[in-house]
Amino acid sequence: SSEVSQLLVSAYPAAHPAYLTEMYSDNTDEQMHSTWSAFDRFQEQAYQWKDIDEVRNAETPYQLWEAHYTAVATANEAIAHINSVNNAHDYDAQLGEALLCRAFAMFQLSTVFCQAYDKTTAQNNLGLAYPTEPEKVVGRLIERGTLAQLYNNIEKDLLQGLELVGTKYARPKFHFTKQAAY
C-alpha cells in the first residue's frame, strides 16, 4: 500500500489556475504609464482576454489542461491497481484519496474550461471528458458529455472518496485526509 501512496503524490495537479483566473478577474488593472509593461506575454494575453498561445508558463490553459488530466490519469492507475488486488479493502484509504484527487482535478478543470454551473442550464452546457480508467489505447476519444454529467461524476467520486479516505498519513501535508478533504 505504500507504493500506491507514493504514486498518489503524482495525482495532485502540478499546476493551479490561481494566476490565470486572477488575470481574468476585476482584481487586475492596467497601469497606463509609459514605464509599465506586462510581466510576460501570457499575463498580457490573459489580462486582455485574448486567445492564449503562450505555453511555457505553468498556468497557461494548455499547462493547466495537461497537469490536471495527468493527475486524473495517475488517480485512474491507482484505482485500477487497487481494484485488481485480492486485498483491496486494505487500500480503502488510498482508494478514497485517488477518488478525491480525480474529483478535485476535474472540478478545477471545470472552473477554467466550462460555463459556471447552473442547474437550469447544466443539461445543455458542455462538460468535459471524465476518464475513469487508465488509457490503454492512444488517441481514444472519451465523450465530453454535459456539465450536469460532469458534476454528477465529480460528486460521485467526492462522496465515495470521503467515505473511504483515512484520517492519518505518514506525511499528511501531501495527501488528502478526511480532515483536509472537508
Where are these regions (language model features)?
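Acidic, glycine-rich segments characteristic of secretory precursors and extracytoplasmic regions
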Residues: 1-28
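N-terminal, post-signal-peptide region of Sec/Tat-exported proteins
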Residues: 19-43
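Short, surface-exposed recognition loops and adjoining beta-strand edges that mediate ligand/DNA contacts
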Residues: 24-33, 115-124, 167-180
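Conserved, well-structured interaction surfaces
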Residues: 42-113, 141, 145, 160-172
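Start-of-helix signal in alpha-solenoid helical-repeat scaffolds, especially tetratricopeptide repeats
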Residues: 68, 96, 128, 177-179
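Well-ordered alpha-helical segments within folded domains of soluble proteins
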Residues: 71-79, 130-131, 179-182
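Short coil/linker segments at helix-helix boundaries
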Residues: 112-152, 156
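Internal metal/ion-chelating core segments
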Residues: 148-182
